[in-house]
Structure formats: C-alpha cells, structure tokens
Amino acid sequence: MDLTIPKDYDPRLSIRETEAAIRYIRETFQDEFGKELNLQRMSAPMFVEKSTGLNDNLNGVEQPVSFEMKDMPNETVEIVHSLAKWKRLALKRYGFGMHEGLYTNMNAIRKEEDLDNFHSIYVDQWDWEKIISKDERTEETLKDTVRDIFKVIKHMEHEVWYKFPQAVYHLPDEIHFVTTQELEDRWPDLTPLEREDKIAKELGAVFVMKIGDKLQRSGKPHDGRAPDYDDWSLNGDIIFWYEPLQRRIEVSSMGIRVSPESMKYQLEQADATDREKLPFHKMLLNGELPYTIGGGIGQSRLCMLLLGKAHIGEVQASIWPEDMIKKCEENHIQIL
C-alpha cells in the first residue's frame, strides 16, 4: 500500500455533487468518444472461459479471479483483467467493416493490484477496438488516434467547467510523443516510472511509445505488456502531469494490435509460445482476424483527473485497507 496525501487538500465537491459529476463525465465522454472514433457501444462479458485464451494476461504473473460453474464443471471461468483480445474477436464475429469499431463498459477485478492513489482492485474502463488496414499499421496511424482521443479528453475539461466550474482540473493544450528508448537515453539512472514523472512534468501531456520490448541500455522492458495483443513497437500510454499529487497519471493504454508475425516474435520473447495452441492465437496466426487498433481508457482515472481528486476511491466504490481509509478521512479525502 502506498498513499500520497496532498497538502491542504480541498475536495471542492460534496460526495453527492461528486456522484453527479461522475455520471455527467461518463455519459458525455463515451458519446463524444464513440462519435470521434466511429465506435458502436456493445455488450461485453465480465468473465471468459480460461481455455479460450481470451483473458488479458497483463504482465504474465497476475492471477485472475476464477471459479467453476455448476452446469460447466469441467471449465474454469475467469473474471476478465481486460477485454483486449475479446474485442478483436468480437469485431470479426459481429461483422464490423473497415474503419468501424466498438467500445464497451468494461468492469474487471485485478486482485493482485498494489493499492495507491491511482490503483484499485476494481477496474472500470472504456475498452475499445477498431478495424484498420494492414497498410495503416504505422506510427502515424497510432499518433493520429492518440490526438483524436486527447481532443475528446481536452473538450471534456470545458464540459466539466461549464457544469462544475469550482472543481475542474485544467489540462495542457496539446499532447507530445516520446519513446521509451528516448527516456532511457535521457535518464538512464532513473526507473521507468521516475522517467515518466520527469517527462510528464516537463511537457504536461505525453504519449509514451513502444512499451514491452527490451531497451538497449538496460536490456529490460520499460514496463510489462502481454505479448498477444499490442504490437510492442506500435503502442503506448497516455499520461498527464498531475499537480495535486506531483506525479504522472496514466489515463489510457493503447496500441496497434499484433500481426501474425509480430505476435510470433513477441511470444518467443516472452517465452510464451505455448499460447499458440489456444483458439484465439490459432485464429490470429492463421490470418483469420482483422487488423486492429485498440485500448482502454480508465473511467475512474478520467473522472479523478478532470475533477482534481486526490484518490481514485473518491470516484469509485471499492475496498481499501482500514489505515488508508483513516488517513484519507483525516485529510478530507472522501472515500466512497
């Protein structure tokens, strides 16, 4: 558990006012985001069968919450970590066409999450996926999509200011791009997270690109990424410098998805070639799935950012250690 207490914190909204603001942000953002990227909202599962290989393995070590169903006693069912792979399969199953996509209201449990101001075991995000052509699997496609998402987030600042002027947190006017290798070259003695703090404070809003593969100096990845959805050379995180906590806040992780060739390489790098036998991976390697770009946008994180909140527990209901709750109460942080 790690907790940062901002000095002289003022939540500015009551709990009931905060709830009204959360609803407004969620409803407004998803409509504008869907229109901007040409996405249709779709229903999505909260759990998947382990044998399908559809669950997100995250960094490869986190264990999902799992159970057995009475009517399917021989099948292990897992609560999703995210819908990263499910969405790509859904685009094929549901007959989406070129430059069409979907988004979902994704709820997940990550029971091994380290709790702090930004992290909860409960994850809520808009998970989205969109079909692109093979020729569009480029850095420029990725950057253009990041700019589109940033434009919607920036517009939400004005929407929130109009409804809740006393609470809105002001965002930078543009987003910048930097690779993880550039960060390591500039600050080789810092940790990846410290590098992100540095660049976010310097630039305000940044898309940190190319996460998952080994860096040249350290020989280690900037951060862990599953080998079977993002292409490690065409992905990244949208981060903002967050003044209330003097740290960067990550709002979205996204990327152009693996091709058959890049997934094969990444599975080898991750020592996970056994996944090639799973149904999803077989389809992908056989070229049966569309080329896509996709990601997730944290709903609670976005609400936290736009409202200037000190703790994610102010914008979502979850479970927290008693000593964390007590410290928050002592410092005017209103945990739901």
UniProtKB/Swiss-Prot annotation:
Species whose genome carries this gene: Limosilactobacillus reuteri (strain DSM 20016) (Lactobacillus reuteri)
Domain of life according to the entry: Bacteria
Keywords, alphabetical: Amino-acid biosynthesis, Asparagine biosynthesis, ATP-binding, Cytoplasm, Ligase, Nucleotide-binding
Catalytic activity as recorded in UniProt: L-aspartate + NH4(+) + ATP = L-asparagine + AMP + diphosphate + H(+)
CDD domains linked to this entry: AsnA (cd00645)
GO molecular function per UniProt: aspartate-ammonia ligase activity; ATP binding; catalytic activity, acting on a protein; transferase activity
Main location, first listed in the record: cytoplasm
SUPFAM superfamilies in the record: Class II aaRS and biotin synthetases (SSF55681)
Pfam families, per database record: AsnA
Locations listed in the record: Cytoplasm
GO biological process, one term: L-asparagine biosynthetic process
Name used for this protein in its record: Aspartate--ammonia ligase
EC numbers for this chain: 6.3.1.1
